[in-house]
Amino acid sequence: MYPSQPQTAAFSSVFFPQQVALITVGDNLLPMGYWTVVSKEPFRVLLLMGVGNHSLGLLKKHKEAAMHFMPWSERERVVRAGYLSGRNVNKAETLGFTLLPAEKLKTTRLVAGAEGILELVVNRELLNISREFAPFIMDVVAVHGDISPDQRHPILY
């Protein structure tokens, strides 16, 4: 681990089974299926942001994001966030999501009502891998949610 890397949170299975996540970068929201765990110790995930996506610019600017695992009952709003552009509209306000301060992140806020949340900071961008997607290794710096797997209602894909 490089000296400038943050202390990562302990691994958590709050996201199992694999599911569609709702990502926040700053105050912007987007649904994401292109993610996976790449390390348990240190706890890291891989995110793939579409090239040209407004959230990609925000991720490069803020170097942080949050990954939310929303209940099945929120699936319509989560999916709808992918049809709106954060360049033109405040998605949280338009879709009725409540944003809360993060524990460790400076500019990115958290979505109320998530069954689990991972606070993430950029470890590195993987360059020259894809023309369509920008892959990022993200360090998990905080984990929220302790709902047992049998009590969760995930948005599976």
Predicted regions and their residues:
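Basic, polyanion-binding surface patches
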Residues: M1-Y157
